């Protein structure tokens, strides 16, 4: 017997340890407690490999909504590349084969450039090591590494240690460090072309401090009070590792935003006023797609195109849907929920409620939850939508302030909004699933009592509000939510959705 379905996402509302750090447990939530007492509920895993992130990494709203809407685990770039390196399938990657074969057959130099650290935000040290190993396997003599130093996602003087580790790896593998420069120059994202030119001149002309010992050169920089992020260009004078016509370049950053500008000046656009020109015949490989407009560059790991998300599948089957949230989480219930698609599907309506204009949300912990709730209840009463998804942002956005009494106020506001929403839904023939995308307000204090502003690794709730007294629900992951929504709607699950229906 099919019904209409409402999916309520309480952002940052995890299942805590019921200790003093667990604001959700310690705040009176009479309506939430009544739901747990009267309806079937279970737990969803919302972090690490259960949402396509590396093991032990906390979930986030983007990844969470992507998994929820996709109905399958969507593997993030880092995990995909890690897997390819671990099982050696990277050796069969057609673009890897083309890059190394081209260099070998044409006697060209191969260059690896990117953020050389273990920060894990833009790049991975392990990926660079693997590229060196592949170069060794292909027997490519001239393998040059251009190191962009970190100091933002890592300690400001950790770079020297990374250069030592890389040097040691190259000795048993392949590759020579040809140049070093801080990410301040090589990874700008604000069109400060005068910074990018410093990196460009180093890579293309070998301009910079000339050094024979790259580790010593790093230490000299520290001695001068210049740390990793701001390291001035250093060129290895013992090799000619500049990028030349027809060479192969692999930019091993997997995050795109800070890799774009250097890629532009090397491959896309001459900037004569800055003295930068693209290099003819360059075989340029990006780890992931940096920009859809880029021409003539190769992509090692393309984005997964998530087909048949819940939104797409409902639209294809003539169902009506509403996506509603306040500004802070609007992109999450639209773009991310729909698998990275901006434009609405047929018969998909959207309501954006402006978030309050305050410096930090502890100043208005209820945010715009009541306004979202009022608009949502109106929409429920029209009975025109087969499916509705709403996000209440407070648990996460106020949780990020780390201010305990503000988080308490946020939790109380959510309890009231959940009550009005669920009661309206029940009165209008909707079944309701209530979940979170990740934890936050459930872990507001560190062990030493200081505020914890980060997401938690805790599981999140799955509450099924139904008139069916025999219903049971199982534990699962975020990818299991969409199949459970289809169960309520009485629709078959498409093959693309590999999550499972948790309603029994």
UniProtKB/Swiss-Prot annotation:
Signal peptide: none annotated. Binds 2 manganese ions per subunit. Its cofactor is Mn(2+). Substrate binds at residues 122, 152-153, 183, 189, 255-258, 329. Keywords: Glycolysis, Isomerase, Manganese, Metal-binding. The keyword Transmembrane does not apply. Coiled coil: none annotated. GO terms for molecular function: manganese ion binding; phosphoglycerate mutase activity. Pathway: Carbohydrate degradation; glycolysis; pyruvate from D-glyceraldehyde 3-phosphate: step 3/5. The active site is at 61 (phosphoserine intermediate). Mn(2+) 1 binds at residues 396, 400, 455. Mn(2+) 2 binds at residues 11, 61, 437-438. One of its GO terms (cellular component) is cytosol. Disulfide bonds: none annotated. Catalyzes the interconversion of 2-phosphoglycerate and 3-phosphoglycerate. Monomer. Belongs to the BPG-independent phosphoglycerate mutase family. PANTHER family: 2,3-BISPHOSPHOGLYCERATE-INDEPENDENT PHOSPHOGLYCERATE MUTASE (PTHR31637:SF0). This is 2,3-bisphosphoglycerate-independent phosphoglycerate mutase. It comes from Phocaeicola vulgatus (strain ATCC 8482 / DSM 1447 / JCM 5826 / CCUG 4940 / NBRC 14291 / NCTC 11154). The lineage of its organism: Bacteria, Pseudomonadati, Bacteroidota, Bacteroidia, Bacteroidales.
């Amino acid at each position: 017997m099919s019904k209409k379905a409402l999916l309520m996402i309480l952002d940052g509302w995890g299942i805590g340890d019921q200790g003093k750090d667990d604001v959700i447990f310690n705040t009176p939530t009479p309506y939430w407690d009544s739901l747990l007492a009267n309806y079937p509920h279970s737990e969803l895993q919302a972090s690490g490999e259960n949402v396509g992130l590396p093991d032990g990494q906390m979930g986030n709203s983007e990844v969470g909504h992507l998994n929820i809407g996709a109905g399958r685990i969507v593997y993030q770039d880092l995990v995909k590349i890690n897997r390819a390196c671990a099982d050696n399938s990277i050796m069969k990657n057609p673009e890897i084969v083309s890059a190394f074969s081209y260099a070998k057959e044409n006697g060209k130099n191969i260059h690896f450039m990117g953020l050389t650290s273990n920060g894990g935000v833009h790049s991975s040290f392990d990926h660079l090591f693997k590229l060196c190993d592949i170069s060794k396997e292909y027997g490519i003599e001239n393998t040059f590494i251009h190191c962009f130093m970190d100091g933002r996602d890592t300690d400001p003087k950790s770079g020297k240690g990374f250069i030592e580790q890389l040097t040691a790896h190259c000795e048993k593998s392949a590759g020579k460090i040809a140049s070093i420069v801080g990410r301040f120059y090589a990874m700008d994202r604000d069109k400060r072309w005068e910074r990018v030119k410093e990196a460009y001149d180093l890579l293309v002309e070998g301009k910079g401090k000339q050094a024979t010992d790259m580790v010593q050169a790093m230490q000299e920089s520290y001695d001068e009070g210049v740390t990793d992020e701001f390291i001035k260009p250093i060129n290895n004078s013992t090799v000619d590792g500049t990028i030349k016509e027809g060479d192969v370049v692999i930019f091993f950053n997997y995050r795109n935003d800070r890799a774009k500008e250097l890629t532009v000046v090397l491959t896309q656009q001459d900037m004569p006023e800055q003295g930068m020109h693209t290099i003819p015949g360059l075989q340029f490989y990006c780890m992931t797609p940096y920009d859809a407009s880029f021409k003539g560059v190769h992509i090692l790991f393309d984005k997964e195109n998530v087909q048949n998300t819940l939104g797409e599948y409902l639209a294809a089957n003539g169902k009506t849907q509403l996506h509603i949230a306040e500004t802070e989480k609007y992109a999450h219930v639209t773009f991310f929920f729909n698998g990275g698609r901006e434009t609405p599907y047929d018969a998909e309506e959207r309501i954006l409620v402006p978030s309050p204009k305050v410096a930090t949300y502890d100043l208005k912990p209820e945010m715009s939850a009541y306004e979202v709730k009022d608009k949502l209840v109106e929409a429920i009463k029209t009975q025109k939508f087969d499916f509705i998804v709403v996000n209440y942002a407070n648990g996460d956005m106020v949780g990020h302030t780390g201010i305990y009494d503000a988080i308490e106020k946020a939790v109380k506001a959510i309890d009231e909004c959940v009550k009005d929403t669920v009661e309206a839904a029940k009165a209008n023939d909707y079944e309701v699933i209530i979940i979170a995308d990740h934890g936050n307000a459930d872990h507001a204090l560190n062990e030493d009592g200081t505020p914890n502003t980060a997401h938690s690794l805790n599981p999140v709730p799955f509450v099924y509000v139904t008139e069916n007294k025999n219903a049971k629900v199982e534990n699962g992951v975020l990818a299991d939510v969409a199949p459970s929504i289809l169960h309520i709607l009485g629709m078959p699950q498409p093959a693309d959705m590999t999550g499972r229906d948790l309603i029994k």
